[in-house]
Amino acid sequence: MTTTIQQRSGANGWQSFCEWVTSTNNRLYVGWFGVLMIPTLLAATTCFIVAFIAAPPVDIDGIREPVAGSLIYGNNIISGAVVPSSNAIGLHFYPIWEAASLDEWLYNGGPYQLVVFHFLIGIFCYMGREWELSYRLGMRPWICVAYSAPVAAASAVFLVYPFGQGSFSDGMPLGISGTFNFMLVFQAEHNILMHPFHMMGVAGVFGGSLFSAMHGSLVTSSLVRETTESESQNYGYKFGQEEETYNIVAAHGYFGRLIFQYASFNNSRSLHFFLAAWPVVGIWFTALGVSTMAFNLNGFNFNQSILDGQGRVLNTWADVLNRANLGMEVMHERNAHNFPLDLAAAESTPVALQAPAIG
């Protein structure tokens, strides 16, 4: 007598699904982080496109003066944006079911929260998916560490800054000119250009661009010739070849003589670590700076710091920058503030010795 034991098809289906999710043979790796990443990024992308094209104006300042951000309300690609949720909503979680109607949800900028929250979850999962694929392939985990820099920057402007300021209306708008407006207002309110962490971020981004260009040009200039004059040098490389495709000794010798010996790396591994670490650390510090300024720990203030022997102010570039900040401050949200507090608190500057006689 023969006994046959048949497993439940449900268990087999779940096992097949698990194997498919974690398989590195798929054209695109899914992974367990991808199971959450795919729907959240699809939701964020879909809502962003629809809102960018057709969303009605949003009462961003909470004063019943809606701001139009979509294309069908007169914007173009440069001026259009998904406008942040209303200051009347503040930091409240505002999904569709919290509004009395869809019109109210749109008027208060609900799509902004939908896009931002799904987008942040999606990029967090993308970072986790990078680690997961590295783990499956037996690679080291530094790819996701590098990606953590832009993730930290996005988290700073979309999540931490609104938390610190007390309203999602202070988050960065999802558009080109809206991003520029966010930057100008950030400078006006927090003096970010005078914050050391922002300076480190500038050094990281510009320095990373410089080092990338230097490295690429040095490698391209010291390729080992494998082709004739009539062929492209790119044909001299075969994918997966064991031998070096460029002469690092020649590149090291050139750069060492161009600058000085110890400015040039003689170890390819330490060189590429440096190329990765420099911009990543810089962007980390920028994100940290935005996150601290979110709670009003602002950039340095050197206004009126130099006086002459009689106590009169000798203006510096810090004072010029301060005047620019005040100008941007009075221009933004001009209908929400009757008078900017930082101007009202300053001493008045006389503009005439006496008033002209009238009549």
From Swiss-Prot:
Note on cofactor: The D1/D2 heterodimer binds P680, chlorophylls that are the primary electron donor of PSII, and subsequent electron acceptors. It shares a non-heme iron and each subunit binds pheophytin, quinone, additional chlorophylls, carotenoids and lipids. D1 provides most of the ligands for the Mn4-Ca-O5 cluster of the oxygen-evolving complex (OEC). There is also a Cl(-1) ion associated with D1 and D2, which is required for oxygen evolution. The PSII complex binds additional chlorophylls, carotenoids and specific lipids.
Pfam family, one: Photo_RC
UniProt EC number: 1.10.3.9
The keyword rRNA-binding is assigned to this record: no
Gene Ontology CC terms: photosystem II; plasma membrane-derived thylakoid membrane
Reaction(s) catalysed (UniProt annotation): 2 a plastoquinone + 4 hnu + 2 H2O = 2 a plastoquinol + O2
Binding sites annotated in the UniProt record for Fe cation: H215, H272
Gene Ontology BP, a term: response to herbicide
Cellular localisation: Cellular thylakoid membrane
Post-translational modification remark: Tyr-161 forms a radical intermediate that is referred to as redox-active TyrZ, YZ or Y-Z.
Site (Stabilizes free radical intermediate): H190
Matches recorded under PROSITE patterns: REACTION_CENTER
Site entry (Cleavage), positions: A344, A345
Membrane topology category: Multi-pass membrane protein
InterPro entries: D1/D2, Photo_II_D1/D2_sf, Photo_RC_L/M, Photo_RC_L/M_CS, PSII_D1
Ligand binding (chlorophyll a PD1): H198
Binding residue positions for pheophytin a: Y126
Other known facts: Cyanobacteria usually contain more than 2 copies of the psbA gene.
PANTHER family: PHOTOSYSTEM II D2 PROTEIN, PHOTOSYSTEM II PROTEIN D1
Name the UniProt record assigns to this protein: Photosystem II protein D1 1
Organism for this UniProt entry: Synechococcus sp. (strain WH7803)
